[in-house]
Amino acid sequence: MAIKKLGFVAVMTAGLLVLTGCASGPNNGVDQSKVDKAAQALLPAEYLDNGIDVASDIPYEPFEYLDENGDLTGVDVELINLIGQKLGTEIRINDAVFDTIIASLESGTNDIIISSMSDTVERQAKVDFVDYNIGGSQMIVAKGNPENITNPMSLCGKTVIVQNGTIQIDLIGTMSESCKVSGKKEITLTQLPDAPSMQNALRAGQGDAVMMDSFVAQGAAAKAGNGEYFDVVSDPEAPNGYDAGFVGIAILKKDTGLRDAIQAALQSLIDDGQYADLMAKWNMSANAVVSASVNGTKE
């Protein structure tokens, strides 16, 4: 069953997560002992006083999703909560559609994005990224891999499902061009709005594979139908996934003060070990960054 857009705001202060229809007062519940004063000093007053609105496309497990109790969780959720603690301000997570998620910053609906968003040169034209992870793409297929999909060339002539607005669109386009150059049939691309829709389409036989974030693919294969619905295609030529690169928190280019404060807060989490603990908790240590860089992806 596809999960509908949630329409809630998740308010997080000092490690407490509450699902609510509106925010309480600014800075309520902030534990000042966890604040990094140097990072906080970089934060423009409007965000210190009013909090930070965060756009996230939910669900996208293990980055942002609802657990069995209906609580919002995931590595992105926990990380932005820790950043809020370092800055001493309130974090409000707002559900957003991924292919219009940058537009939600431009309209003023949200201030930043944390949604397993790849740091790309194209996106850097509109936003800056504070990079916090290294990720790639992998495929899931129906259990037993009936189409014997093992690598990009085995996708030639097949239908691949991806999410709207993601880097996987260009990735499949490049793979399809390789098929054409090799004299094989091109790949048919199907775009859908979210991870549940993609999984449902694959189960319904509307595609031969889904290309998605590696960690999301692994989680889907392990959990969907208690592990009975999907397999992950593990390509030895791409052990970290296809097109592995930086994943970042996105901030509009004009909001340099907010960007610098978030970068400093993330660096503080790296320095005090909380970031390493978080990545270990979510089995992502191999994908951790060593420092909080801005726009790490280059031409």
Which stretches of residues belong to each language-model region?
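A ligand-binding cleft/hinge motif common to bilobed small-molecule-binding domains
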Residues: M117-Q124, L171-S178, D208-D243
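Periplasmic-binding protein-like
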Residues: I58, I134-V141, G225-A264, S285-E299
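Ligand-binding clefts/hinges and TM-proximal coupling segments of bilobed small-molecule sensing domains
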Residues: S24-K37, A41-L43, I167-E186, Y229, ...
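Acidic, polar ligand-binding/catalytic clefts
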Residues: E90-S154
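Bilobed "Venus flytrap"/periplasmic-binding protein-like clamshell domains
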Residues: I58-E61, L72-Q85, Q138-D194, Q199, ...
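C-terminal motif of bacterial Sec signal peptides marking the signal peptidase cleavage site
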Residues: L16-G21
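Extended ligand-binding regions for polar small-molecule ligands
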Residues: A23, V77-K86, M153, T159, ...
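Extracytoplasmic small-molecule ligand-binding "clamshell" domains
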Residues: G29-S116
